[in-house]
Amino acid sequence: IGRIEHGFRMRPDLVATDNARNPRDYFGHIYFDSCVHDDAALRYLIDVAGIDSVMLGTDYPFPLGEQEPGSGIIALKLSNVEQSRLFHGTALEWLNLPYSRFAQDDTE
């Protein structure tokens, strides 16, 4: 995003020809998956895009995903709330589905 934003600011004649909106303003409207195969890259993605824009990725049906899906998320040693956000919260929000639809009711 830094390179695109730099072009937007420095060369609007090339980059901002059809849109006066800064490319960084689109963050929060774009979603990313966690399957980046690098702990530092995942940390950076979360820091730049925001945890609310990142969700678990598996690369299914392709055989290039993590050996254990979610292991990259676990490796970051995030809080339980942050892990829950990445494992299911962001996806449920994006799909406009309530958590209760999938949660087990332990009160019965």
Where in this protein do the model-derived segments appear?
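Aromatic-lined glycan-binding groove of carbohydrate-active enzymes
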Residues: 1-27
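Mid-to-C-terminal alpha-helical segments outside catalytic/metal-binding sites
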Residues: 31-32, 36-55, 62-108
